Amino acid sequence: MKQETGKKRIIIAIDGPAASGKSTTARKVAHLLGYTYIDTGAMYRSVTLKALKQGVLDSLHHSPESVSGLLHDIVIHFEGDHVFLDGEDVTAEIRSNQVSREVSFISSLKPVRDRLREMQQHLGRQRGVVMDGRDIGTVVFPDAELKIYLVADARERAKRRHAELTAKSAEGVELPDLDSLEQEITKRDRDDAEREHAPLKKHPEAYEIDTSAMTIERQVEMVCQLARARE
């Protein structure tokens, strides 16, 4: 959608815990405003996938500093809704359960956060961007004109994750049940909030939106209204 002329292009930072609706909201808001959407979670998942493919995850758990070698020549880019890692389309692979289990650990490594923060800030220089993640409003773009913090109860987020996995998984593939997903999400919340570098937290200026009982259309509408008031 074409950006309206005569309006200031702003940076919209959307943060929140796993499966709170960040990516879906950010993608739809970007489309409606004619902005660029940048999925930072996909970037961390891409690094995690690369570690898995190279078989270095165990060694990273023992020697986290060795992650620098993994980041040396990494290339992550987006084409529409597709994510490319070193030239390969990994859109589906980065949503696997294995990646989901390890991404919090990879995200806790300072060299990873530093490298991806540089990439994210470079992508946001053009302004007119919607970026979602866990530290966008607090670390990557603390001066973003609009900061949003989405929350939802763990059970509701587990239901969303299950629906996402069901839609994207091949027929016959066994999926984790709701209780397992809820436990995984709760652990991810704890890991994200307690990590040493750039922990998940709400910026004092962020608007908190509880999406537990809210339609995606309504939360998108709320964010767009807040954004248009700042353009």
From Swiss-Prot:
Keyword Protease in record: no
Gene designation per UniProt: cmk
Family of this protein: Belongs to the cytidylate kinase family. Type 1 subfamily.
Cellular compartment(s): Cytoplasm
Main location: cytoplasm
UniProt-listed Enzyme Commission number(s): 2.7.4.25
The protein, known as: Cytidylate kinase
GO terms (BP aspect): nucleobase-containing small molecule interconversion; pyrimidine nucleotide metabolic process
Lineage: Bacteria, Pseudomonadati, Chlorobiota, Chlorobiia, Chlorobiales
UniProt biased composition (Basic and acidic residues): 184-205
Catalytic reaction equation(s): CMP + ATP = CDP + ADP; dCMP + ATP = dCDP + ADP
Highest rank taxon of the organism: Bacteria
MF term (GO), any: CMP kinase activity
One Pfam entry name: Cytidylate_kin
An example Gene Ontology CC term for this record: cytosol
